[in-house]
């Protein structure tokens, strides 16, 4: 699968490469302090907004990207955002969407994601499908962010709940939306920005148009962005020359009894018809062909009783239908290409505000984003293979009209329905078996903002104060359609079971999940100084009234026919009365009373959170910088639902940092911080599809998960650039996981019986350690005769699990550390023309393979692996360039995987892991997870 074209990076090379990251380095750390203060005087506010040290002194584990960085890196989606940031990965949800980020060995709800300080939706699934066919109800995805609306992104690696609240165990990703000033050029009162981009790997086309103004105290902006794309295509070599041969079942009319020469076979007479018809039989039935029909043909030949032309035609029709299918057309578990997907999104961002008194601002914001991922699951076999003949056995083979294929069907394994039990329910052989998955997201936010701004170190009560209220609703709608209503080989997503299509069938397994947040935040900043010290104090308050609503909705439809024998006609011929086809509608909703997750009624949890935080970033003299902060959170969850957890959680988090600067070129930093995560809404709802719990039984209480982060770093800076090397250690305690726990419950007679209860438990403690390197070399600063603007960048991250301990009374069903990203190096060489007219860059990436030992876990006494395979090492090279024309037009282009290497990333292969929301564990061909081959992106930006 993997062709090794890697480059070697040694410790010597790292040392020589010294001092790198253009994307992570702070402008203020690249030059002397004196020159720094002079060059940043006019952009103090903006620099503070995007600085790595804006919240704590060390900057360790921080990555800050501006909208300019996103444009330069040609970020067209969530998978592009962290392309060159080792240690930060995207969690693939399995159905085209994503489940958030993976940082420091944890992922999903353990990495906080926020926009303008408002938390985004949690990843939510129901453990078990509603329709009984396997899989999971619910999306498991979070809403993705529209990057054209974003001004800055702060990625915080390591526990950080004192800044980001619940969920920041492994880290946090905080987005800030654009302001009017981001669209307006200096010296103007209005501005228009337009952008069009295309990415070939998923054929995504994006167009965005934004306008902003600032006049007489009023300012505002409006941005509209639309995207349309397809599934990400794997390497082109994957499907070259691949062809599948299949043998499928069909129907034939048994006109002759081949065992005897010229003997007619079984015929029947339908009520209302005059002529008898041959019974329909299954073509391709291996047992029948081997033990009867084909054997009889050979016996006839031996007995010199040749078949006549009609008999030979019937024998041919009785054989399996052989087809040769391309890689694009093939359906089944061995499919080598990914499922076809249609992706669309649309987003609005609007802001309007008024400045008055020189220091005050009042404004409002409106966001509305829709995303849809419409997929056809091509691992669902469209045809019925010869290995499925048994399910069509014992069918009468009678039919109405001339389509003899209507005589063959099978009874699906579905829930019993209320109604007439004499109705024959079945799925016809002649219909294509198809499965579609529709994943739709909607996010809407409305907010009000008051901001007070003053000069730093003023005599006023605050340098800055912000009061905001946001009302946000985020919903995911996941619908799985199973259709058997289009005649093979046709595929029709709009078809449904109907009376004119006997034994047609459709089912809908739908799940809605919605979170609502009403968030009130207040923050106050004040800078103080005296002869020896400088302080920057930040005091924060917040209140969040939240609600989680889950609603399953599963409907099934089946076109049924009453079929009953009425005896014989005058010629002793079977005679059937065939009732008219009718559509029988059935619903699992609420039918099985013990399975509460199948009741199609909203299930609600109300939540509230109050927090207060205080942070001080201060310096003593010129040698020491410090940061110290703490936060107090109190969360309440209440519900009227049976067997849903509720409770109060009080959590405290903190952070501290110290920087020692013996000279202006070198510093030593130490950072310590903590994090917590209260149980997610999914964990509060729990699992209740396996047992008939006795009345009064309560789920075991869950504690908040905890995290501790320790980092030490060495930093060099100067005219030559910047280098940071850090070592970190993270410890996680009381991690929540799905597990089996032996519990004694009374049976129907009242006697205690020990059974395994599968649910969420505080099950694990674990620790890991690692190394992180960031840097940038400015070659003109190293040697003055080299061109100004020539640079080299480096990023490296390695994480190694140290220990995992499980509760001895639990049998775990998942392993937490499959989220650890393999070690990765990213080395870049580039040039930016000093006046910004043009630039070019090459990025080299090398990743080690996934360690299989990190995938092993114990389920009881059995050793298991969360995936069947681990990724191998891989390397790739990307080239990008930009050209500015007359300051208003920028053309950007990039070629990725320029060497056209074939490889599989661990993030993609992890979709087969047990922890994936929509797992593809049944795949027998892993080519579908291969990374794209050589691909490109183009972008055209216009500013007026």
Curated annotation (Swiss-Prot):
The lineage of its organism: Bacteria, Pseudomonadati, Pseudomonadota, Betaproteobacteria, Neisseriales. It comes from Neisseria meningitidis serogroup A / serotype 4A (strain DSM 15465 / Z2491). Keywords: Cell outer membrane, Ion transport, Iron, Iron transport, Membrane, Receptor, Signal, TonB box, Transmembrane, Transmembrane beta strand, Transport. This is Lactoferrin-binding protein A. InterPro entries: Plug_dom, Plug_dom_sf, TonB-dep_rcpt-like, TonB-dep_rcpt_b-brl, TonB_Hb/transfer/lactofer_rcpt, TonB_lacto/transferrin_rcpt, TonB_rcpt_b-brl_sf, TonB_rcpt_CS. Unknown. May be an iron-siderophore receptor. A motif (TonB C-terminal box) lies at residues 927-944. It is a multi-pass membrane protein. Its main location: membrane. It comes from the Bacteria. Residues 1-27 form the signal peptide.
């Amino acid at each position: 699968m993997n062709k090794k074209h890697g480059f070697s990076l040694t410790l010597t090379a790292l040392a020589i490469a010294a001092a790198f990251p253009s994307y992570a380095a702070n402008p203020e750390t690249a030059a002397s302090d004196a020159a720094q203060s002079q060059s940043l005087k006019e952009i103090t506010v903006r620099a503070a907004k995007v600085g790595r040290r804006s919240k704590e002194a060390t900057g360790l584990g921080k990555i800050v990207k501006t909208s300019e960085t996103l444009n330069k890196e040609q970020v067209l989606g969530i998978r592009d955002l962290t392309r060159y940031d080792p240690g930060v990965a995207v969690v693939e949800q399995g159905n085209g969407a994503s489940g958030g980020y993976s940082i420091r060995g944890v992922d999903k709800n353990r990495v906080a994601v926020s926009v303008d300080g408002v938390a985004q939706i949690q990843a939510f699934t129901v453990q078990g499908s509603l329709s009984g066919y396997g899989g999971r109800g619910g999306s498991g995805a979070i809403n993705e962010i529209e990057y054209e609306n974003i001004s800055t992104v702060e990625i915080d690696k390591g526990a950080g709940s004192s800044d980001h609240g619940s969920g920041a165990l492994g880290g946090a990703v905080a987005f800030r939306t654009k302001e009017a000033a981001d669209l307006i050029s200096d010296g103007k009162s209005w501005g228009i920005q337009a952008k069009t981009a295309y990415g070939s790997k998923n054929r995504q086309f994006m167009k965005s148009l934004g306008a902003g103004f600032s006049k007489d105290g009023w300012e505002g902006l409006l941005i509209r962005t639309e995207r349309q794309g397809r599934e990400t295509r794997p390497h082109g070599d994957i499907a070259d020359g691949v062809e599948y041969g299949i043998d499928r079942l069909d129907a034939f009319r048994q006109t002759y009894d081949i065992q005897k020469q010229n003997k007619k076979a079984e015929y029947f007479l339908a009520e209302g018809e005059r002529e008898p018809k041959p019974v329909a039989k299954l073509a391709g039935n291996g047992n029948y062909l081997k033990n009867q029909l084909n054997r009889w043909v050979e016996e006839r030949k031996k007995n010199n009783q040749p078949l006549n032309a009609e008999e030979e035609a019937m024998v041919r029709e009785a054989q399996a239908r052989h087809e040769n299918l391309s890689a694009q057309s093939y359906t089944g578990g061995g499919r080598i290409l990914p499922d076809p997907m249609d992706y669309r999104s649309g987003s609005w961002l609007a802001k309007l505000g008024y400045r008055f008194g020189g220091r005050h601002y009042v404004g409002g914001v409106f966001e509305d984003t829709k995303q849809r991922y419409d997929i056809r699951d091509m691992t669902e076999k469209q045809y019925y293979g010869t290995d499925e003949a048994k399910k069509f056995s014992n069918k009468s083979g009678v039919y109405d009209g001339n389509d003899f294929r209507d005589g063959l069907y099978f009874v699906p394994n579905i829930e019993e329905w209320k109604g007439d039990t004499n109705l024959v329910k079945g799925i016809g052989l002649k219909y294509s078996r198809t499965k579609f998955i529709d994943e739709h997201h909607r996010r809407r936010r409305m907010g009000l903002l008051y901001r007070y701004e003053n000069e730093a170190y003023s005599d006023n009560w605050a340098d800055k104060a912000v009061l905001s209220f946001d009302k946000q609703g985020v919903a995911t709608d996941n619908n799985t359609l199973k259709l058997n209503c289009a005649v093979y080989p046709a595929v029709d997503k709009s078809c449904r079971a109907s009376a004119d299509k006997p034994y047609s069938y459709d089912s809908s397994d739908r799940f809605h999940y919605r979170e609502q947040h009403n968030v009130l935040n207040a923050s106050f900043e004040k800078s103080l100084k005296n002869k020896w010290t400088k302080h920057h104090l930040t005091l924060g308050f917040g209140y969040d009234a939240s609600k989680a609503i889950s609603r399953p909705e599963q409907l099934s439809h089946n076109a049924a026919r009453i079929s009953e024998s009425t005896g014989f006609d005058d010629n002793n011929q079977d005679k059937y009365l065939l009732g008219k086809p009718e559509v029988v509608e059935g619903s699992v909703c609420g039918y099985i009373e013990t399975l509460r997750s199948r009741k199609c009624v909203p299930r609600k949890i109300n939540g509230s959170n109050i927090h207060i935080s205080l942070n001080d970033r201060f310096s003593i003299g010129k040698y020491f910088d410090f940061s110290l902060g703490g936060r107090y959170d109190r969360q309440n969850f209440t519900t009227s639902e049976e067997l849903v957890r509720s409770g109060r959680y009080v959590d405290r988090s903190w952070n501290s940092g110290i920087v020692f600067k013996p000279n202006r070129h070198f510093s030593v930093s130490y950072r310590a911080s903590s994090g917590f995560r209260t149980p997610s809404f999914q964990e509060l709802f729990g699992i209740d599809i396996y047992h008939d719990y006795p009345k009064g039984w309560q789920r075991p209480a869950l504690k908040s998960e905890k995290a501790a982060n320790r980092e030490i770093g060495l930093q060099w800076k100067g005219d030559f650039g910047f280098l940071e090397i850090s070592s970190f250690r993270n410890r996680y305690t009381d991690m929540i996981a799905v597990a089996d726990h032996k519990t004694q419950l009374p049976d129907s007679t009242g006697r205690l019986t020990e059974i395994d209860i599968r649910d969420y438990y505080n099950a694990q403690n674990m620790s890991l350690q690692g190394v992180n390197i960031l840097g940038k070399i400015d070659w003109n600063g190293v040697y003055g005769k080299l061109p100004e603007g020539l640079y080299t960048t480096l990023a490296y991250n390695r994480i190694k699990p140290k220990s995992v301990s499980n509760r001895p009374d639990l049998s775990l069903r998942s392993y937490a550390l499959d989220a650890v990203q393999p070690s990765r190096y990213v080395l870049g060489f580039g040039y930016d023309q000093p006046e910004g007219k043009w630039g070019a860059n090459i990025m080299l990436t090398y990743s080690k393979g996934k360690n299989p030992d990190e995938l092993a876990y114990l389920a009881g006494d059995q050793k298991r692996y969360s995936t069947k395979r681990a990724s191998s090492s891989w390397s790739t090279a990307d080239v990008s360039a930009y050209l500015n024309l007359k300051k208003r037009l920028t053309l950007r282009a990039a070629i990725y995987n320029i060497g056209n290497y074939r490889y599989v990333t661990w993030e993609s292969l992890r979709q087969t892991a047990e922890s994936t929301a929509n797992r593809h564990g049944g795949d027998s061909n892993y080519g579908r997870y291969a990374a794209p081959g050589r691909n490109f992106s183009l972008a055209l930006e216009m500013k007026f």
